[in-house]
Amino acid sequence: MVKRDKIGLTEEVHIRNTKVIARIDTGARRCSIDKQLAKTLNLGPVVDIRRYRSAAGHTRREVVEEEIILKKTKMRILLNISDRRRMKYRMLIGREALRKGNFLIDPLR
């Protein structure tokens, strides 16, 4: 049986030698990062522009590929850049990254 790292609903993520507290969201397919944080970290280049559906309607967002470390697991993921300044967490980790890292989510952590 493969050992799976347990993660909670929020986790510390390292991106470009910067610690960010990210929200783990199994309802989101992809990962997202705040546009101001992306600018501060100088993320890029933009690899795609995709259309996303949200409660506010449809938006087009830039997508970058970046390496992150989550629970000692290093992985390259796609991050869409969005305005998250009104959100509690500046980064969101979606299902694609969770599958890639083979994580087990423990909501009590």
Language-model features, listed with the residues they occupy:
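Pepsin/retropepsin-fold aspartyl endopeptidases
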Residues: 1-109
